[in-house]
Structures are given as C-alpha cells and as structure tokens.
Amino acid sequence: MSATKEAVAAKESITAKMARWAAAVDFSHLSQDAVFQAKRFLLDSIGCALGGYQQHDVKIALQVLDEVAGRGPATVIGTGKKIDPVSASLANALMIRCMDYNDIYWKQDPSHPSDIFPAALACCERAKSDGRELIVGLVLGHEFEMRFCEAAFPGIRERGWHHATLTAFVSPFVAGRALHLSWEQIQHAVGISASRHCTLGAVTAGKLTMMKNTVDPMATQSGVLAALMAERGYTGPEQVIDGKEGLTHCFGPEWK
C-alpha cells in the first residue's frame, strides 16, 4: 500500500470501513461452520415467527399494515402475502421478536441479532437474490450487532438507552448489502437510519408494554427504508459513528 493510500485508510471513518466490508463480503468467504450456524439461526427465526404470528400484538400490527402497506415483492411470513420491503421487514421482525424466544447475545449490551434477519429477507426478495445472499445477510447482522454489543463499558443500556439504538446502525448494512448497494451508498444508508433512531430504555423499565418487543423490529425497518433511500441517491451523515456528535462522541470516551 502506498503512503497516500495508507493516509486515506487512516482517516477513513468506521462507518466507511464497515460499509466497504459489507459490500465486499461474499458467500465464498464464509466458513462451513458459519454457514451451518447461520442456517440454524434461520430455522430458529422462522419457528419464532410462526409462533409470533399467533400473538395479539402481531395481529394488531398486521391489521395496520393491511391498511397502509404497499404492494411489493417481500413475503410476510405465515400469510402468503407480498408487500413492500419496508412494511414486510417490520411485520416479520415483530413476529420473530414478540414472544422473546429468539436468540440473544449479551456482553456490555444485550441484543437479539435475528431481529435483523427480516431486513435481509425483504431486500433479498426485492433484489431477486438466492439463498446464499440471504445467508450472507444473516451473518452480517450477527457479526455487526455483536461487535456493537462489545463496544464500550458501561454499555448503552447502563446509560438509559435501549439496544435498538444499535440495531438502527446495523440493519442498513444488512439491507444495503442485500440490495447490492455500493459501499458509499451503504455508508449513507447507515447515516440515514442511525441519525434518527435512538431508542429510550423506558420500553424495558417499569410496566412492560407491547413496545418492549417492537422497538428493535422498528429499528430493523428503519435500516430497510434507509437503504432504499440511499439506493436512489439520498445522503446521510458519513461519520455517524465516530464523527462530531456521532455515536462515540455522544456516549463518551469509553467507546472504542
């Protein structure tokens, strides 16, 4: 690498580095074990969704989406319906999440990485991709979400924020990759989603309501919307993680 390229790489934002990696990763790069585990999480997520489909909060959400969702290529699990990717990602993520049975990863912050899988599903269907791309999306969601969970001590939950805040950073990487966006477009998608979706920890404090298991699906939905906007040329802050008044600036020097 030349001195010029090294200087550029040193100045490159964390968002740009992650976006480059998301855009470049290929199914052939994944180990056999990673693919096997991704398939396990995929099957587990579908099982959770089929159980979630029966729940009252999901039925309410589906009624609302029946009224407002547009036509599209994205499947709503358990219904046989095809709607727009933004609405489908919310419906499917809520089904997976609502019973609290899906996977969990807990380090400095907790998360349920499979909540992000519906972003990959909806966008892969829109892009008419095969199952390999779906597996890539699932792996990306888990890899990035879990890394964010280890980013600082204390985590954002200890500071009064909900981990859906982190999902709003991760889901546009997944959605953007599934839509085959350039790394620059993915970077903008992250800026669009993350800059407007910070979730208060109040949803898990005191009396629990339906929103406890809805905020993360909404963050997943945010990433899909952001990726679709970036695909058309919409821009967002490029240094939303490590720039001025970005994530690390706002949460303090403990963030890595």
Model-derived features: positions:
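N-terminal core-entry segment
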Residues: 2-256
